[in-house]
Amino acid sequence: MRPVRRSAAVLFAVLGCASGRQRPPPAEPVDLAGAARSALQHAWSGYRRYAWGHDELRSLSKAPRDWYAEPLLITPVDALDTLILMGLHAEAEEARAHIVQNLSFDRDIEVKNFEIVIRVLGGLLSAYQLTGDPRLLALAEDLGRRLLPVFDSPTGMPYVNVNLRTGKTSGARSNPAEIGTLLLEFGTLAKLTGNDVYQAKAKNALTQLFSRRSPIGLVGEEIDVETGAWTSRQSHIGGGIDSYYEYLLKCWLLFGDEDCRGMWSSSIEAVNRYVADPTPSGLWYGAVDMDTGRRTGTEFGALEAFFPAVLVLAGDLDRARQLEESSFKMWTAAWAAADVFDYAAMRPTHPRWPLRPEIIESAWYLQTATHEPRWTAMGRRFMGDIEACCRTDAGYTVLDDVTSGKQGDLMPSYFLAETLKYLWLLGTPGALDLRTIVFNTEAHPLRRTW
């Protein structure tokens, strides 16, 4: 069986994916790494042709999209380490040159701290470690300095937004993910620059959040960073909370931080006790009240599918396997992993899939830990579906509806940073050693050199 070619992908997209469940399974590439590398070349070529100098590509309109009034080159920064790892040297050098010559953070724009940290700060730090280019570290340090005012709240937990030029902050209503998903990046910046304030501020934010957990050990999904009061007391592992748990564990793995290890151990015990939901259809993680553990929802989705990866890192392979199998049932119930999937009814309730990486990420971690062929086979299925349903003339695009195959009009930067990277890694066993690197939540590998 040969890798899906462009003509086949277009045929599936028109005649198959759009017709929903009647579509036969797509052609799956034998050479998964080669298919992922070719997909990255196609995606980069489309961005280069239609959105150069901008943040992202509208891949149906063949037009650029910027996040703010002025672009921050989010796709080139997010994609650079993927280009390097896949050996696309000309494209990587093109991206690096464009970044160091054109990226400036001296801009009068208000940005979302969390997204800029995981994508841009994380991307710059990873690319610096891979290339040794001091200009990338200088950009990272300039960005980190401009983001520091977010921590100037009464609690030390960060505001949501900050103006890169003035330092003015806004957005007191935040969530555990946006508060607790900063320490890998700010900690690495501190280690590489010798300025400990970055790590201290981010760790204080994390510990302040942890200290506000409920008596049964859970956090809610929204908190006021000025008062420290929870404004939503629903608990789960999905969007708004997800990477908080990820970073509790990974900050111990990257920095050897015993405080983080203790916070992780306490938290995962509570999550597995209250949030996990063993059902006849498999193991899932739903939603509960943070104070009582009472079940409030049976919704799982594409973002929650990151959790098997974290369980692998924690050594809980049995639970990781079970949850990844459940995630795969969610994928095959339609033609990708819906943003929201009701596992009690086994159907999508919010059927969008914006090219997310999490289910693929978890398959790679399981493959790395177990060497079982099951996970690589999953990767081939994921790659085949992406080619069939999401490929366009200009790159790849999100699915607005996984049940019908209706396409949207955006190629998010994380598709290049994460989704294609994890597909390539699934097809390239041993390419990265998890004993020496830790991925941030945007799949930027950070190497412990201290």
Task: Pin down the residues of each PLM region.
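Glycan-recognition and catalytic cores of secretory/periplasmic carbohydrate-active enzymes
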Residues: 18-450
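Bacterial N-terminal signal peptides that target proteins for export
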Residues: 1-8
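Coiled-coil-like amphipathic alpha-helices with heptad-repeat character
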Residues: 1, 16-18
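Bacterial N-terminal signal peptides
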Residues: 8-16
